[in-house]
Amino acid sequence: MKYFEFGQEHPELMVMLHGGGVCYRGALPVAEEMAKTYHVVLVAYDGFNPDEPETQFRSVPDEARRLGDYIVERYGGKIDILYGVSYGTFVLMDVLADKRLTITTTIANGMPTMDYADIKSPVLQNLYIFFLTGFSYWLIGKAGPIRKKLVCKMMGRTEESFDRIVYKDATWQSWVNQDKYMIGRHRNFDLFKRTDMYIWHGIASSTEKKLAKHVRAWQDKGYAFTYKVFPNMGHGTLAGEHPQDFSKEVQAAHQCSLQKEKR
């Protein structure tokens, strides 16, 4: 696990968590854009880092715990903006659960609103992983030209951005561990109260529409978050393909958080 830092001259700290099955390099352009305003820590997960090909992804709690250690040791546990996209929002939730940390603004972009299946039987878990992970690994992790076009259409992304983010050398076990340790885990909505929580979805893709399907139910239950839809964006494309627009949205959200703190 590595941490890449940009804009150290700025006082406010922004932590960025990329999605699953991809590497940190896809987030470099937006990290560099955000570094014009914030001190940015871009996280590179084990198992999906081309700079550390010998590593293996273990679990979401493991990634979150070590990130928490890093922030506590170097920055006293203070995060001004915590950002995660797609699978990275699972890591984000475990970071929110770390009581050592104080987080002002949290932005979950492309957050899946459904939990993994709650399966107790090890045999059924293995079957679930075989089909769920196997399909993702085949479709994304080992995508050829035809599958790449399909994924880009589903996600509303360009092929150039797909080539930049996907890490094709990740091991099968790293892909398995991404999903295995999420089985039976349920989102703790009380954690939303520990921060000023924002959930964003860009619904110009079939993938994102499915991920957002339970947002209305969350709103009806009164969970503490601010919701925003980007109708012309696909899955992760606001940050991945429009870094300047992304920066404006992040700054606006964070300013709202700071205003709320003053009330």
Cite the ranges covered by each PLM segment:
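Conserved HGGG/HGGXW glycine-rich cap/lid loop of the alpha/beta-hydrolase fold
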Residues: F4-E52
